[in-house]
Curated annotation (Swiss-Prot):
This is Phorbol-12-myristate-13-acetate-induced protein 1. A motif (BH3 2) lies at residues 80-88. The keyword Repeat applies. The gene is Pmaip1. Residues 92-101 are annotated as: Required for mitochondrial location. It holds the Pfam family PMAIP1. InterPro entries: Noxa (IPR024140).
Length: 105
């Protein structure tokens, strides 16, 4: 908006203390464990090691399996087959029309 001044950055909070080095190192180790081995049992074990933290319900849920349910796969195959049939029909019609025009010229 014209005529409006840009906001300044938020002032520094002097009451905010820096983490002691041992806490920072512990958080780094926990973060490395979480990011390197990304599975629900490992995360809950790492969260259990953290003092004062409880594991969330979302981490307790089982991660979705990478394999699909066969019914969903069959439905998707049927849908792709129908799409392929439509494309094939359009291509055949286009070829037929182009042959008709080529015969005239």
């Amino acid at each position: 908006m014209p005529g409006r001044k840009a906001r300044r950055n938020a002032p520094l909070n002097p009451t905010r203390a820096e983490l002691p080095p041992e806490f920072a190192a512990q958080l780094r180790k926990i973060g490395d464990k979480v990011y390197c081995t990304w599975s629900a049992p490992d995360i809950t074990a790492v969260l259990a090691q953290m003092p004062g933290k409880k594991s969330r319900k979302s981490t307790m849920r089982r991660s979705p399996s990478p394999t699909r349910v066969p019914a969903d796969l069959k439905d998707e195959c049927d849908q792709l087959r129908r799409i392929g049939d439509k494309v094939n029909l359009r291509q055949k019609l286009l070829n037929f029309i182009s042959k008709l025009f080529n015969l005239i010229t």
